[in-house]
Curated annotation (Swiss-Prot):
GO terms for cellular component: cytoplasm. The modification 2,3-didehydroalanine (Ser) is found at S144. GO terms for molecular function: histidine ammonia-lyase activity. This is Histidine ammonia-lyase. There is a cross-link at A143-G145 (5-imidazolinone (Ala-Gly)). Its main location: cytoplasm. It catalyses: L-histidine = trans-urocanate + NH4(+). InterPro entries: Aromatic_Lyase, Fumarase/histidase_N, HutH, L-Aspartase-like, Phe/His_NH3-lyase_AS. The lineage of its organism: Bacteria, Pseudomonadati, Pseudomonadota, Gammaproteobacteria, Enterobacterales. It is an enzyme of class 4 (lyase). GO terms for biological process: L-histidine catabolic process to glutamate and formamide; L-histidine catabolic process to glutamate and formate. It comes from Citrobacter koseri (strain ATCC BAA-895 / CDC 4225-83 / SGSC4696).
Amino acid sequence: MNTLTLTPGHLSFAQLRAVWQQPVQLRLDSSAVDGINASVDCVNNIVAEGRTAYGINTGFGLLAQTRIATEDLQNLQRSLVLSHAAGIGEPLDDAMVRLIMVLKINSLARGFSGIRLSVIEALIALVNAEVWPLIPAKGSVGASGDLAPLAHMSLTLLGEGKARWQGEWLPAKEALKKAGLEPITLAAKEGLALLNGTQASTAFALRGLFEAQALFASAVVCGALTTEAVLGSRRPFDARIHAARGQRGQIDAAGLFRHVLTETSAIAQSHHNCEKVQDPYSLRCQPQVMGACLTQLRQAMEVLLVEANAVSDNPLVFAEEGDVISGGNFHAEPVAMAADNLALAIAEIGALSERRIALMMDKHMSQLPPFLVKNGGVNSGFMIAQVTAAALASENKALAHPHSVDSLPTSANQEDHVSMAPAAGRRLWEMAANTRGVIAVEWLAACQGIDLREGLTSSPLLEQARKALREQVPHYTQDRFFAPDIECATELLARGDLFRLLPDFL
């Protein structure tokens, strides 16, 4: 099990990926305690002095002008959580809930939220005991924060709603009891601190980024395999070409292709003196297209890493000055735009892969048997597998539509511009699954193509990629039930069998 000592505001990309991938035992670094306590003292002073401060002793949203009596402050926070837990849809899986909770803990522990250490520790206890609140996937517009998802998360702290413990959905109070935990009572501002923030949006987009990273690597390997299968040239990957343009993503993508292809191979030597002058764009322009995608991945990582360590609560408590200031850090526009750009990259990675598959189907372009199978006519080979890839690539074109340009006013027009970041991030998961399916078909096709270059081999890394597939999926000598092979290749991709062949590139 992964152990993580959390220094608030300093989560790394590798740590975030690890939190998503496996259970974690959290410990809060002691350096955070003074800041947390100071922010609570500031809130308590405001209550004691009778000053009016939004979210502490007022209503919320359009009801912000309503002053709440001191004796009602605890009930105010509980009511907020209950009323805002209005999500809908399938429950998020444990990995997503875990990532959301760790992001929330990281933000609250920065000491700008006026929430007691004991509440943060209660969240940490849920993570460590693997008690996972039931959080519906839908219901947030990404401003004012991810209210509904985070309210569902917070219900479990109060012993309300449902939670999963040891794989079973239980009433939250029962799940807490089985895990040796107890419900808590919220004090002034604490319900709002728990609910306000971009943690669900950020977690959704981070998962999209994690998957896009693996897809990018897999597509580089499969693109190189296809280049070999159709007797493509290594010349378009020459470093001098890409240095002349100067686009960093393109330069680095070309380097990755050179890494997996190496300088030559038996296949490359077999057509060294051929008369072909140029390859089709789907081969020749791989560094340019994949480089542009790599740039989007890197920019998204930069934005999402900042947001993962951000304070996106409202209002914020500045304990040193004794100020509580309302702002808009809950607005997830940076996350929405990052997710939209990731969508473009995921779609293009799949679109380029599909074009390479189509290239292999055409005997005139590939110099291989039609549809990569002998005795064509009796056998249809990869004919419909390519159609499946085309269908998936086409779906992604519609899914890539930007969400950040959409907005619907909420809360009686008080919250009149929103980010739609949760939907922007969540659709990335479907897009990633589609692109993974496309790449799986290309992997199958490219290995079949290389098999058909009888007696010739590719580079050592590409032969590793071919061996990894051939250990599970045999060569096609004649038609057989195709879907299980695509499913198998997809599972191998999801496991990271090709991802691990590349050095770190983000």
